[in-house]
Structures are given as C-alpha cells and as structure tokens.
Amino acid sequence: MWGALRSALRPCCRAAVPPQRAYHGDSVARLGTQPDSASSTYQENYEQMKALVSQLHERAQYVRLGGSEKARARHTSRGKLLPRDRIDNLIDPGSPFLEFSQFAGYQLYGDEEVPAGGIITGIGRVSGVECMIVANDATVKGGTYYPVTVKKHVRAQEIALQNRLPCIYLVDSGGANLPRQADTFPDRDHFGRIFYNQAIMSSKNITQIAVVMGSCTAGGAYVPAMADENIIVQKQGTIFLAGPPLVKAATGEEVSAEDLGGADLHCRKSGVTDHYALDDHHALHLTRKVVRSLNYQKKMDVTIEPSEEPLFPADELYGIVGANLKRSFDVREVIARIVDGSRFNEFKALYGDTLVTGFARIFGYPVGIIGNNGVLFSESAKKGAHFVQLCCQRNIPLLFLQNITGFMVGRDYEAEGIAKDGAKMVAAVACAKVPKITVIIGGSYGAGNYGMCGRAYSPRFLYMWPNARISVMGGEQAATVLATVARDQKAREGKQFSSAEEAALKEPIIKRFEEEGNPYYSSARLWDDGIIDPVDTRLVLGLSLSAALNAPIQRTDFGIFRM
C-alpha cells in the first residue's frame, strides 16, 4: 500500500549513548536506543504489557462474535451474512478495516450484554474510496438501538463529517430499544440526530448510501429514505414507519411485512429504494458499483513521501512502557518505533523539556508530534502552544502522545503564571483546525488531558493503549483531598478524625477511581475510539491520517493569548 525508502543519514543517538557531533546537512535526526532486554525493568514491563495485550485480544475476539450462538445460527439460516462478513465482502480484497469503539457497551448494562454496542463502525476502502461503514448487528438484541448504539452511530457520522468520508449504512435493525426509549429518543444527540446528520452530510456532498439487508422499522426507515442512493434485498429487507403489529393495532389492517415494506413494493411502486438485490452478496456487489460511480477524487493538502519502516521492532514498546504508570520512560523511544525511519526533527529540544515536540512522517504523511516526558511547566506549555501554531501555519496534522499527570502546581508556579501559560496551550489546541489525533499511552489526568487534546478538544481520532488510565486525578490524590476535607470538617465541629476513619473513607474512593479510570470503562462509554495494541499504533495512525486527509485543511484562527 505504501512504498519504502531507506536513507543513509547517520543516527543521532540519545540518552545512554554518547552524543555525536551535529551536522547541518542532516535535516532530520534518527531517534531511539537499543533497549537492554535483559534488564529486570524491561522484562517486567514486557510481561505486564504482554498480559494486558493478550487480555485485549481475548476480549476483542469475544466481542467480534456478536450475539449468542443461537442468534447467529438463526441469522445465517435466513440466508443472511453475519455483519462482519458483510463488511469483509464490501471492502476491497486485502485492504484493512479500521474499526472503532469495539468495546462500546462493555459491562455497561449489568448482565445484559451488548457486544460492540450492537453496531459495527469503521473505515474501509470500497472501490478505492475510503468510506465510513456502519453495520447493524441483528444478532445482538435484534439490532435494536441502546443508548450506546445511538452514541456510537452518531460518533461514526461525526468522524465521517469531519473527514468528508462517504457513508455506507448496512441496515438490519428493529429500531429503538423500547424499554430504554427515554435514553435513546428525545434528546439532541439521540436517535433523531442520525437522520439530521444524514441530511447535513448530503447537503455538503458527503455521499450517503443505505443497504437494507433486514428490518428497517419506525424512525430507522429514514436511514434509506434519506440516503442519496439505496439498495434493498428481496424477501429480506423491509422498510416501514410502522410494522404489521402496529398497523393492526392502529387501523385493524392485517398485512405481512413483505407486502407492507418489502423490496418489490419499494422498488416497483413507492420508489423509496433504487436497487433490487437478490441476496446479501448481490447487494454488496451493487454497493461497490454505486461507490465506483461517485466520481470521487481524493485531493490532499500535504506532501507525501515514500514510506520507511522504523529502525526498531514495534514489540519493544511493551518493554519500554509497561503497565506501571509510576515508572517513567522517554517518549522519544515510543516515537522512534512509530515514525518513518525513526526520524524526528525535534523542536526546542533544550527548552521546556518535559514536553517533546517535533516533526516526522508516518507512512509518508507529515505529522507534528507532541509527547509528554513529565508534568507540564510554564515553559513546556508555551513551547507546546508555539508548536501547535507552527503546525497550523504549515497545514501539518498533529499527533498527541498522552502520558500526563497535569500542570505543575504550587505557590511559586502560580506566581509565575502557570494558569495563563497552560491556557495558551489549551487555547491553541482547541483552535487548531489541522487534523488532530490523540493516543493515550499512559496516564491522562486533569487539565493535562485538555492541553494534550483529550476528547473535549475534538481530535479526529482518539485511541488508548491497554495500560492507559484516564481520570480527573489519581485515586490516591482524590482520596487524600477528600480525606483532608473531611478532617477539616471534623475539626470545625471540634471532633477528631481518626486514622481508621480516614482509611475507611479513602479505600472505596481509590477503588472507584481505579475502576473508572480503566480503559475498558472509557471505551464502553465512547470516551475514546478504541483500545489498540501498542504494536498496531503505527498502522492505526497511518490509516487515520489517510482518512483525515480526505477533507481540506481549514485555516486556523486563534483568539487572545493572555501574555
């Protein structure tokens, strides 16, 4: 997919390696050192991360099954392909599928399992065009929409809108989950937003294609009705605002689902659908033909260079980072294992050194990287804001590698203006219109999450490693703060606050923060776009950058920076 090129630039070593003379002719230095794989720290990190990755793959495999074995058997007995098989038959042979939010709904509804939130979303290449694919999974609760299903569908549309990706909806759904209608129907970002988004995207020439491969009931009927072009499968796909039971209850009329809203009715009489498919395979073949007719040409605002593999194996990331967030690591070692040729043109290397900034390429795409090497000081924040401005001026996408405890606190730092300096970085990140991608490779705490482009700052994509943690602060810190408040309250009342009382107060707080900071807790609620194996980071970033560059890069306008 991407070409390869090796250069003869001499490596510029760091850290444990003696420094080399800098040559002005070398525009970009090589990063990375060979880790001591025999060290106890490396081996402990490796084993811990390997265990987390094994758990990730095991859970992902279970989610990929979809509904129960009985539900899957019933689905295929009707001549239907399973939703993941539909996607495999839709995308170009041998091309990757960048799936989002695999763990949506994970342990979210108690004993009620909703694998992948009952819907599969991701970017795949169809007839050479990168498309957003949204596929209902009818083996999971009949494909009905839980609150998390709606959220995941709407998030997929948001990604499509931001990156100007044609949308393909593989429809097979019973509509809203009625027992949970209060959390799926009335609010701004509930079920109706799906159709609103379709209308808005169509108005912006972002193609909407619907393939009706099963039930399409009630409000869900608007998915094909509002599509630019649609397809329906005979004796399988149905579209109606009210199904046979509701029609009978409302009017007394008895009618079959096929007669009420089948392929013959909608292709021959109502005109609701455009193409008549004989089965799933035929429908997907027709879909590929529709995409081929879009006359789509991708125009990118960046220069692309031939791709190079990093100089270091990706699995060394396991030994470098590990699961213990209290153990520090140099983010440059992470960068060296994901960027082309391990080349990194560092910016302001000697200033604000707890924030690493610089330019690199990933699969030939230019990227400005911002990575954490400790707490953010005023110098780090000002450096980060400056670098964001450079990337916006040059139309270079931004990659944030988050491992941040937050901004530095204390009287001296407040006096030096940490609040206004941190605000500069937060404002720059908020205003930046270049594509922003965030990977949480360690901790993501407090205002550091904001400065490093957390979810609230609209990164095009946000991924987490399985060792990551996200929270307003660490559990120990939160427990200590609340214990201090309780002790002060007792003191005002003239009472003692015993160590036993303090321990009893702190224990559940620490436990709760640990649970809520877990990446699966985050992913279940769509605070991210997926948990990824560190080894896959480079590929995921390459696919994400490629998708993001379907949209023209807009000019960035910054507001007031308090000096």
UniProtKB/Swiss-Prot annotation:
Pathway: Amino-acid degradation; L-leucine degradation; (S)-3-hydroxy-3-methylglutaryl-CoA from 3-isovaleryl-CoA: step 2/3
PTM-bearing positions, type N6-succinyllysine: K70, K141, K433, K495
Residues recorded as bearing N6-acetyllysine in the entry: K70, K495, K511
Keywords assigned: Acetylation, ATP-binding, Ligase, Mitochondrion, Nucleotide-binding, Transit peptide
Reactions catalysed, as given in the entry: 3-methylbut-2-enoyl-CoA + hydrogencarbonate + ATP = 3-methyl-(2E)-glutaconyl-CoA + ADP + phosphate + H(+)
Superkingdom of source: Eukaryota
MF terms in GO: ATP binding; methylcrotonoyl-CoA carboxylase activity
Gene Ontology cellular component terms for the protein in this record: methylcrotonoyl-CoA carboxylase complex; mitochondrial matrix; mitochondrion
Family, as annotated: Belongs to the AccD/PCCB family.
InterPro entries: AcCoA_carboxyl_beta, ClpP/crotonase-like_dom_sf, COA_CT_C, COA_CT_N, MCCB/AccD1-like
Stored Pfam families: Carboxyl_trans
UniProt gene name: Mccc2
Subunit structure: Probably a dodecamer composed of six biotin-containing alpha subunits (MCCC1) and six beta (MCCC2) subunits.
Chain positions covered by the region annotation Acyl-CoA binding: 343-372
Enzyme Commission number, as recorded: 6.4.1.4
Localization (cell): Mitochondrion matrix
Protein name: Methylcrotonoyl-CoA carboxylase beta chain, mitochondrial
Transmembrane annotation, as ranges: none
All copies of domain CoA carboxyltransferase N-terminal, residue ranges: 49-306
